[in-house]
From Swiss-Prot:
Root EC class: hydrolase
Location(s), subcellular: Secreted
Molecular function per GO: calcium ion binding; calcium-dependent phospholipase A2 activity; phospholipid binding; toxin activity
Protein name: Basic phospholipase A2 beta-bungarotoxin A5 chain
Taxonomic classification: Eukaryota, Metazoa, Chordata, Craniata, Vertebrata
Keyword flag Secreted: yes
A biological-process GO annotation: phospholipid metabolic process
Top-level taxon: Eukaryota
Family: Belongs to the phospholipase A2 family. Group I subfamily. D49 sub-subfamily.
Cofactor needs: Ca(2+)
Length: 137
């Protein structure tokens, strides 16, 4: 099945452009019946914060993404949540543009890797909105 998403740029707050771009990548890679928001509070790492061990492959995608953003901040002095970048969604993959080592390219590669990981990982309904105090220590 092919999902078609009509995305308008008029309502994008500039300070959150990267999050919009990441959301668009996720929409491109996940199954049609899912929404990007279903990934925002999943497991121990998908969403704000994170602790403990990832509970499955999908949660591991978010764990790796958190660490990738952490490296971008610490090693490269980037701000991943506001950093915009150039990319293309084409032929079932995502292409990041920009010179290697630039903040835009580093953050794009973090988001690209995670979005593709989401597309290749099973979504387990029981891992949405879990009790993180109990399962993520």
């Amino acid at each position: 099945a092919v999902c078609v998403s009509l995305l308008g740029a008029a309502n994008i707050p500039p300070q959150h452009l990267n999050l919009y771009q990441f959301k668009e990548m996720i929409r491109y890679t996940i199954p049609c019946e899912k929404t990007w928001g279903e990934y925002a509070d999943y497991g121990c790492y998908c969403g704000a914060g994170g602790s403990g061990r990832p509970i499955d492959a999908l949660d591991r995608c978010c764990y790796v993404h958190d660490n990738c953003y952490g490296d971008a901040e610490k090693k490269h002095k980037c701000n991943p949540k506001t950093q915009s970048y150039s990319y293309k969604l084409t032929k079932r993959t995502i292409i990041c543009y920009g010179a290697a080592g630039t903040c835009g390219r580093i953050v794009c590669d973090c988001d690209r890797t995670t979005a593709l990981c989401f597309g290749n990982s099973e979504y387990i309904e029981g891992h949405k909105n879990i009790d993180t105090a109990r399962f993520c220590q």
